[in-house]
Amino acid sequence: GRPEFTDPLPLGGGYLAALLGGRFVVVDVRRARARILYEDYLKMLGNGSSVSQQLLFPERLVLSGDEYALLEENAVEFASLGFDIDFAGEGTIEVKGTPADMPADAVDQMVYDLLQAFSTPVSLADQRREKIAAVMARGGAKGIPRNMSRDEAAALLSQLAATGNFSFSPSGKAITAEITPEDIRTKLG
């Protein structure tokens, strides 16, 4: 079977330590979250079922004519990601709901980044899906991890292990780093 994370220990500063198949590793919490969300969004884009959270104050955005048209064309996919959007005309949209794990202050940036991803031709469906999932994961992982409890750390690590890829974040950055006895010897001199 695949190696399991055990003995999680939150380190603060957005990191946690754990054993991975007997090796001592440090995990970047934000990148781990991005990997988990990325896999979740890829699945969602496949079957279109995301949870939307209603915003207390809808966010009004003014788009260019092209962006507005692109958004209208892809309205169904935006909805499947968990966006609740009203088209007010004149290039104005009102975002009334966002995906459940999206920080509210990331909404406008998210919409613009997603429009970039959606401008990938539909003929490149897989690439397009991956780009969209990567944008969503980046947005969702933005919230700075506060200090985690041991249980939260354990839950995050088991979700990470379930993705089958705990080496790299969607943007290709390392999620885990092994700390070897040599590293420790060097540090302690």
Q: PLM features: what roles do these ranges have?
A:
Residues 2-189:
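Long, charged low-complexity intrinsically disordered regions
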